[in-house]
């Protein structure tokens, strides 16, 4: 069965959310959009507000998922985070930008069955 990249990305985000919850994060929002910018996951890690980008690939043959978080993509995430924070009750919390990279070794029937997940905290700065 062939896969649709959008389905792989959606399953990657679901896998990331499950991972974060197991690590004790509280998920506040998924797929937050501000204009053309999006943040995949917004979560609390204790008292730190985390803006998390998830990149999923079916293999590393087309490059590691982290390579897709380019400086331009980082700027887009920062713009969306700034918009999110403008509506946040003050005082603003400590914030950080994380990236979760997933390589799905087995993606069948629309589900990721085997994968390698890498969570990079403080992956980039403003």
Swiss-Prot record:
One of its GO terms (molecular function) is nucleic acid binding. Gene3D superfamilies: 3.40.1350.10. InterPro entries: Restrct_endonuc-II-like (IPR011335), tRNA_endonuc-like_dom_sf (IPR011856), UPF0102_YraN-like (IPR003509). CDD domains: PoNe_Nuclease. It comes from the Bacteria. Belongs to the UPF0102 family. This is UPF0102 protein Cphamn1_0017.
